[in-house]
Amino acid sequence: MLGRALRPGWLGITRTVVKKPSCGSYFNRTFQTAINTTMPPMQEGMLSTMMMMTATATRITGTVSEPLNGSNIVMQLDSVMRKRKKKMKKHKLRKRRKREKAERRKLSQGR
């Protein structure tokens, strides 16, 4: 739930991501060449994960520093919760009907 809230695209905040071209493809490409020439595969994997971590960290700090109205986030989360509740209700109802139908079938077969 929170992961979705922290993802900038989901909240409609895309400007902060565009502002930082350092985590773009050009940066990755230069990094890749440096890795391939100097490191064995295991360290390469570790480095890529570190890079990912730093990229996400910068993105999150970017979104936090930007003034965004908290009510909007709350509204979106609220709607998500409402949707989930509705789905659950529907699911439970369907399950109950199925069970009742199965019971009726058993009763009719027993006769």
Curated annotation (Swiss-Prot):
Disordered: annotated segments: 82-111
UniProt feature, compositional bias: Basic and acidic residues: 100-111
Major subcellular site: mitochondrion
Residue ranges with Basic residues bias: 82-99
Signal peptide from the UniProt entry: none
Keywords, sorted A to Z: Membrane, Mitochondrion, Mitochondrion inner membrane, mRNA processing, Ribonucleoprotein, Ribosomal protein
Membrane topology classification: Peripheral membrane protein
GO biological process: mitochondrial ribosome assembly; mitochondrial translation; mitochondrial translational initiation; mRNA processing
Subcellular location: Mitochondrion; Mitochondrion inner membrane
Molecular function terms from GO: structural constituent of ribosome
Cellular component annotations (GO), alphabetically ordered: mitochondrial inner membrane; mitochondrial small ribosomal subunit; mitochondrion
Domain of life: Eukaryota
Function: Component of the mitochondrial ribosome (mitoribosome), a dedicated translation machinery responsible for the synthesis of mitochondrial genome-encoded proteins, including at least some of the essential transmembrane subunits of the mitochondrial respiratory chain. The mitoribosomes are attached to the mitochondrial inner membrane and translation products are cotranslationally integrated into the membrane. mS38 is also involved in the splicing of the COX1 mRNA.
Family listed: Belongs to the mitochondrion-specific ribosomal protein mS38 family.
Subunit structure: Component of the mitochondrial small ribosomal subunit (mt-SSU). Mature yeast 74S mitochondrial ribosomes consist of a small (37S) and a large (54S) subunit. The 37S small subunit contains a 15S ribosomal RNA (15S mt-rRNA) and 34 different proteins. The 54S large subunit contains a 21S rRNA (21S mt-rRNA) and 46 different proteins.
PANTHER family: AURORA KINASE A-INTERACTING PROTEIN (PTHR32035), SMALL RIBOSOMAL SUBUNIT PROTEIN MS38 (PTHR32035:SF3)
Name of the featured protein: Small ribosomal subunit protein mS38
Species name: Saccharomyces cerevisiae (strain ATCC 204508 / S288c)
